[in-house]
A protein has these predicted regions:
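Viral virion structural and adsorption modules
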Residues: 1-85
Length: 85
């Protein structure tokens, strides 16, 4: 990996870790997209740290959303997570 590349990993406790790498040019373009998309928001995404938090929270959001969709099939308390900052 080169400086600025991104590594995304999902680890299951007691299991294996799956990892993908994204090159720095892709990260720069993705950040530019989010900066433009959120430019009118009260807290726009302008930095790598803000983009990282946005991406990790996006992934967590989808995992929790999919889990909570199973309420129709099984009975349990809806799940939540603590967002990264």
């Amino acid at each position: 990996m080169a400086t600025g590349d991104v590594t995304l990993s999902v680890a299951v406790e007691g299991g294996v870790t799956k990892t993908v790498a994204i090159d720095s040019a892709t990260r720069v373009l993705a950040l530019a997209y989010e900066t433009a998309r959120t430019s009118t928001f009260p807290d726009p995404v302008n930095t790598d740290a803000e983009w990282q938090a946005l991406m990790v929270n996006y992934l967590a959001d989808h995992i929790v959303l999919n889990a909570n969709r199973q309420q129709e099939v099984v009975s349990y308390t809806p799940k939540t997570y603590t967002a990264a900052t």
